[in-house]
Amino acid sequence: MSKRTEQLGHEIQRILGEVIQYELKDPRVGFATVVGVEVTADLQIARVRISVMGTPDERRETMAALERARGFLRRRLAEELNYLRFVPELRLILDTSVDYSLHIDELLRRAAEERADSPPQQPEDDKPAE
């Protein structure tokens, strides 16, 4: 990724985050956060990773509402990024990495609890000879 596409990705992330949080009035949009944007080298496509808190149904509903608002989001980007000739097409992607990390944390917590609850076992080699 070139420095230009990386900078543009950060700028798109900032703008979309603010627009989704403060300007989008759709009540179906739950707690959504733009966690990253990858812009193609030709600046035609921006893959926008979005994390949504809530149940699977709430996530689907939020992503569907954001898909319907894609035109509005792109129009707001065009207003903010007026130095670009073309505004990238937005591809909205549900990011589940936060869920995965929470799942891993839970597994590690359980393993630590199980280890604390079970008595330490003596290795076979350390047992006294009879």
UniProtKB/Swiss-Prot annotation:
GO cellular component, one term: cytosol
Main location: cytoplasm
GO MF terms, alphabetically ordered: ribosomal small subunit binding
Keyword Transcription: no
Record's keyword terms, sorted: Cytoplasm, Ribosome biogenesis
Subcellular localization(s) per the UniProt record: Cytoplasm
Entry-linked PANTHER family: RIBOSOME-BINDING FACTOR A, CHLOROPLASTIC-RELATED
Family stated for the protein in its record: Belongs to the RbfA family.
Function: One of several proteins that assist in the late maturation steps of the functional core of the 30S ribosomal subunit. Associates with free 30S ribosomal subunits (but not with 30S subunits that are part of 70S ribosomes or polysomes). Required for efficient processing of 16S rRNA. May interact with the 5'-terminal helix region of 16S rRNA.
Protein name: Ribosome-binding factor A
